[in-house]
Amino acid sequence: MNFELNEQQLSIQKMARDFTEKKVAPKVLDRDETREYDVNLYKDLCDMGFIGLPYAKEYVGQGLGYMEYALAVEEISKVDPSLGVSFSVATSLYGGSLYFSEATDEQLKRFMPPVLRDGHLGSFGLTEPTAGSDVSGMLTFAQRDGEEYIINGSKCFITNGPLSDYFCVYALTDHELGPKSIATFVVERNTPGFTIGARHNTMGIRSA
């Protein structure tokens, strides 16, 4: 078995390294100290095709694999863990929650391109004050109302949250089934009743 990187993988690795050294590294400490997120860096990642690396081209991905994606995340995270986490949340957690779910082709074509290509941030809404790694403590509930759902609950420690336009939100849909009824909903930032609360001053990864 050949464990060497192929030419395409080496090219992506070098592209990520060069971008990181030139554009990410110069102000990384300032961003961490001020807890500021540079959206332009994320847009650069979109322009280079990094955000959609592992997804099919029909959903504006690059049609490559997770090795290529991991190499890009690794190079960026070496210098700026916050940007690396932001990148991986948008790609793996937001994008993956849609791509590997029961989302329809119409939904994928509506909600993948804005985050993978157009520079809009995506977030993953799972963690709550009572539920994180243990999702059985989840309280957020989605009640069906005709053709729509009304979601009540709150999430915390949501990477990209303050600036995201799209959120994959996890919620219970049946009180009796509990965690077995958890479903994924895409919530757009301008949805009526949706608000973003105060930001926590975390120990690390402060500018994500």
Give the residues covered by each predicted segment.
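Short Gly/Pro-enriched turn/cap motifs at secondary-structure boundaries
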Residues: T130-S133, F157-N160, D174-E176, N201-S207
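Hydrophobic, small-residue-rich alpha-helical packing segments that form membrane-like cores
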Residues: S133-D134, Y149
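A structural signal for short hydrophobic beta-strand segments in well-ordered beta-sheet cores
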Residues: T140-Q143
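A short core secondary-structure module
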Residues: E148, N152-G197
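Flexible, small-/acidic-enriched active-site or ligand-binding loops
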Residues: G137, N190-A208
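Internal helix-loop-helix
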Residues: D47-L121, N160-Y166, G178
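Residue-level signal for inorganic ion chemistry
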Residues: Q9, T20, A72, T104, ...
